[in-house]
Amino acid sequence: MFEVVIGLEVHVQLNTKTKLFCSCPTSFNHKQNTNTCPTCLALPGALPVLNKEVLNKSIMFGTAVDATINKTSYFDRKSYFYPDSPSAYQITQLYTPVVEHGKLRIDFEDGSHKTIRINRAHIEADAGKNIHDGAISKVDLNRAGTPLLEIVSEPDMRSAEEVTLYLKKLHSIIRYLDIGDANMQEGSFRVDVNVSIRPKGDEKLYTRVEIKNINSFRFIQRAIELEVERQRDAWEDGTYESEIVQETRLFDQVRQETRSMRGKEEAADYRYFPEPDLLKTVITDEMLEKYSKIPELPDEKMARFVKDYEMNEYSASVLTSAIEMAHYFESMMEEGVSSKNALTWLTTELQGRFKGEINISNSPVDAKKLALLVKRIEDGTISGKAAKDVLDYLMQNSVDVDSAIDTLGLKQVSDSGAIEAICDAVIAANGDKVTEYQSGKDKLFGFFVGQVMKESKGSANPQTVNDILKAKLG
């Protein structure tokens, strides 16, 4: 039996307006090599000046994961030669990072929990981007110098499931703090996975393999499963020592395998030394006091939802997993609808209609509109069934709820006189069924309700229909 040992390095692009050491903008999708200056191009004589906002966001993150925030930290040079690094080194923090010794709790479906230790979170400058076009490689340096917070876990995870839970929790914390957009497709939340295996009960750490830059939670989970299978097969075949080497691998989603990219360097290979162009970084007491006051985090919001809205932990976790979802729900609650109905119509009905690029952030039906639709169910204006048709219409048309109801002709009839006339007609047309019902065949009651709803084209108030039929059928 083998045990899987996994540690993660997550590179979070911080959402500052300018780069880490210069005033170039960090915005995405600009023309190649236009967001650059002598500093981020590493031209001779250009000196770095630290962006203070990066420190502020680091304090917020350190507070969120209950970490030690070092009031004094230092920058170091990490030397390597890649085309996307014009300076031939990266400014990072090896010896004294800004954040150390944090922790993050992950929650399993069975209600159990596990704490994953965070070794450190350090500030570093991002590299540019290599663009491979057939036999030609191009370099875009717009991203060079963008501020990153690299969050390094301890090797505490034992399965792909734990990794996914950790990453989703970390992702939501970044979004709740609003220190980064954490967009995996745009590369602002990049994950390197370090995987090894060992015999169960063995405390030794065996050869670890790094899998780099996987851009979705699903692909990360699959890459881990494939790499663990590769290492386990090598161990069982007796080829572990020769086949499993310390290296960097890529996940090939088409061929469903991890494949070798390059040998993995040791720290000594990077020739770290203190950054000579930057002084020590000092966090003042005033900065600590101001930026350690952070917004409500996912776990806190979940606990509040359970208490305030009388829902179970699972429902609360669904609503708070993404800050956009939590904000949407709370906006619905401000309109005075029931929490139970808001939960159902948000998580089941609305989300069930999202396709392609549509999501909670750009939904054509905003929280106020969905809340009004729920209100129209609660006040008897329309039935729940009719409301689904209204929601379909609202997803395609930019109109208000009441206009949609009128256009579709779905307003519920609660006039007891009109409903009674329909009930009389249905009873008169189904005398044989009336006799059977009155002889004890109670299940036929649903037949009469269905016929009345059919005759009213779904517009009759179901409760009124039930009351009238019960009185008439006995």
Curated annotation (Swiss-Prot):
The keyword Coiled coil does not apply. PROSITE patterns: GATB. Keywords: ATP-binding, Ligase, Nucleotide-binding, Protein biosynthesis. One of its GO terms (biological process) is glutaminyl-tRNAGln biosynthesis via transamidation. Coiled coil: none annotated. Its EC number is 6.3.5.-. InterPro entries: Asn/Gln-tRNA_amidoTrfase_suB/E, Asn/Gln-tRNA_Trfase_suB/E_cat, Asn/Gln_amidotransferase, Asn/Gln_tRNA_amidoTrase-B-like, GatB, GatB_C_1, GatB_Yqey_C_2, Gln-tRNA_amidoTrfase_suB_CS. Pfam families: GatB_N (PF02934), GatB_Yqey (PF02637). One of its GO terms (molecular function) is glutaminyl-tRNA synthase (glutamine-hydrolyzing) activity. It catalyses: L-glutamyl-tRNA(Gln) + L-glutamine + ATP + H2O = L-glutaminyl-tRNA(Gln) + L-glutamate + ADP + phosphate + H(+); L-aspartyl-tRNA(Asn) + L-glutamine + ATP + H2O = L-asparaginyl-tRNA(Asn) + L-glutamate + ADP + phosphate + 2 H(+). Heterotrimer of A, B and C subunits. Belongs to the GatB/GatE family. GatB subfamily. Allows the formation of correctly charged Asn-tRNA(Asn) or Gln-tRNA(Gln) through the transamidation of misacylated Asp-tRNA(Asn) or Glu-tRNA(Gln) in organisms which lack either or both of asparaginyl-tRNA or glutaminyl-tRNA synthetases. The reaction takes place in the presence of glutamine and ATP through an activated phospho-Asp-tRNA(Asn) or phospho-Glu-tRNA(Gln). PANTHER family: GLUTAMYL-TRNA GLN AMIDOTRANSFERASE SUBUNIT B MITOCHONDRIAL AND PROKARYOTIC PET112-RELATED, GLUTAMYL-TRNA(GLN) AMIDOTRANSFERASE SUBUNIT B, MITOCHONDRIAL. This is Aspartyl/glutamyl-tRNA(Asn/Gln) amidotransferase subunit B. The lineage of its organism: Bacteria, Pseudomonadati, Campylobacterota, Epsilonproteobacteria, Campylobacterales. The gene is gatB.
